[in-house]
Amino acid sequence: MLTNPSQVIIRNQDSLSQHKVLVLNHEADLLPKALLDVAASVDALALDYHHYLHLAPHANSKLRCYFGHDLPHQDPLEREKYDTVIVYFPKAKPLAPYLFNLAANHLVPNGQLLVVGENKGGIKSLVKLLPEYFATGMKLDNARHCLLFGSSLEGSAPAMKLSDWVSQYQLSTPQGEISICNLVGVFSEKRLDLGTELLLSHLPTLSGRVLDFGCGAGVIAAALLKAQPSLSLECVDINAMALASCELTLAANGMTAKVYPSDGLAQTTGKFNGIISNPPFHDGLASTTSIAQNFVTDSAKQLQHNGIWQIVANRHLPYSDIIAAEFGQLKVVADNNKYKLYYFQHK
């Protein structure tokens, strides 16, 4: 089943006949594979690890699948070139200019740019957002509550440098000052959000192997290692920009941890002495509640004997019931008007 934006691309796939195509920020469907009906070859870069895992089993000699903030390359001046680049307009609008710059660095001169997105997702501002090295965006289609715009590469784009897309700032935490590196598209208030502040203000003493689930830009990871530098810390997230941010944050603070993508806890192995998280479950949507349920269930199985599990969750959402059903006896260590901090020790 194709998502609505993907269906709009299929409606307009004739312009891709025998093209070498790159798809950026694709969704959890098989659109890149479907394009092989007309395209000569397709490469696909997912910024969401779940989306990558959905497509990757279908890779072949004409369909290459990648996950990350960039395509793999040896020399930034020798990037692979494509006749057409398709960009799925990102939910995090600040990420859009990054994707356009990446697209331009991979297009042949006068190559075709297609940008698709849902009407409610910010794509209506596409014409204003396109950099000057692209021709003025033209609306090509309006269907399935989505818009499709087309453009072409007219000028020379700046080379892709990750450092151009990072904001670095100092953050005061209960553990002391840390330096945070935040890539575009990654959540940041440039101060401690209430949930993370509650967690860090009641940080337990941990030992051994510890997991930071949904690590984001690495705020919890850096604070944790500042207070307890001997920990063997693993940081997981589903978002490529978050993982890259976390790696930059750790490096900026002279810290080391294992940082890697995981769809929930599926890519983690073994058991942990500690699991800490300010998980991204705060919107109350049914799909998000399901992810929360899976995280709680799976993390309970991966906690060592005497292991510590501590997460902060929105007090107005039904996660306390989910947590209590899995762990039974647990403590609410602290709370404020928005969050509760849950603690469990595996006896």
Swiss-Prot record:
It is an enzyme of class 2 (transferase). It is found in: Cytoplasm. Coiled coil: none annotated. Its main location: cytoplasm. Gene3D superfamilies: Vaccinia Virus protein VP39. The keyword Methyltransferase applies. Keywords: Cytoplasm, Methyltransferase, rRNA processing, S-adenosyl-L-methionine, Transferase. The keyword Translocase does not apply. It holds the Pfam family MTS. Specifically methylates the guanine in position 1207 of 16S rRNA in the 30S particle. This is Ribosomal RNA small subunit methyltransferase C. It comes from Shewanella baltica (strain OS195).
